[in-house]
Amino acid sequence: MKIKVKVGLEWHQRLCSRKLFCHCPSNLNLDPEYWITRKLRISSSELGELDPAAAVEAARSRIFNYGFNRSSACLVELDEAPPFPLNEEALMIVLKMALYFKMMVVDEVRVMRKTVIDGSNTSGFQRTALVALGTPESYIETSEGKVSLKTLCLEEESAFIVEKGGSEVSYKLDRLAIPLVELATAPEIRSPEQAEELAEEVGLMMRLTGDVQRGLG
């Protein structure tokens, strides 16, 4: 039986650059030298409202342990210092990709914050910047037709989970804030085979830029 599907894909690929909001290198798999313990609490937004999903997570009252090495994390990752200006090298890489995929660069790149209190980010939110939007020329041709590209973003990666228990979770901070390019398509994929073909094509195109890391996250 042929299954009808309507699918969009989203890629998150690490960039070959230092971290997004500090000068730490993107060194992975370093053994932690130190551990800190935190408990994240929910607060109201600028509109005085509480995020429902964040409220549910806060009610679990979990303890978060963070391991870090001074060669790959600093006070910014620990949320003990404000973020530095956005990594311009990473931004330039994503701007080049926008031209490569024939997307329209936005007039002003602004960093947005998404509430995340599952412990994967010490600050309690993830930073993302919209860099480009799709145009009629922004598409990937497949054997089953065109698939439109919708958005291109620059964002920070989350911390790496080491161990998870009922009321306690442990993370490593070497991965936190590594710059990622995020590319999203329109939901125009009509079969699993087309999705696989598209994923392979976009992955190859990104690697050909020479500006992305290889391997699984």
Regions found by a protein language model. Name each.
Residues M1-G217:
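Basic, nucleic-acid-interacting segments
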